[in-house]
Amino acid sequence: IINFLKDKNKRVSTVQVQFSLLSPNNEKQKHVKKICDQNKIDFLAYSPLAFGILCQDPSITDTGKRSLLRNFIFQTYSKPTLELRNVMKEISNARSASLAQVALNWCFYQGVIPIVGLRKKKQVLDICNVFKWDLTQREFEMLETASKSCVKKLPDNPFSSL
């Protein structure tokens, strides 16, 4: 497609894929990222917080009122993602950062541009702090290991499969 478009003086500017610590096929997505880098195409990550699952503190089981869909998502993914979220919490505690910042820095570490849905002022203020620090290689590797060993990932198309 890239060469076809070049022949027509057109180009792909961005590619948007599901990319988070809970995405399936992250190795495939990393291959797509490499192709994007080679062709100067921005790689955008949708659902980098995995519908908020990656923001759920592993030590808190009741997180208040949620919609029917959110309740289903959290009930389905809370236990299988506990170890991953514990690793995220360890990093967030060491960095005095939120779990959301850890998840987004995992994206940034790889040169990925996350698309984040923010609904509340406190979320906006929190995400602004993501630019004040970077993951170390060790922290990145800890997250990668925990992500790979996570037994339940999001479906390939979470918008039609949840």
Predicted regions and their residues:
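Beta/alpha (TIM)-barrel catalytic core signal, keyed to glycine-rich beta->alpha loops juxtaposed to Asp/Glu
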Residues: I1-L162
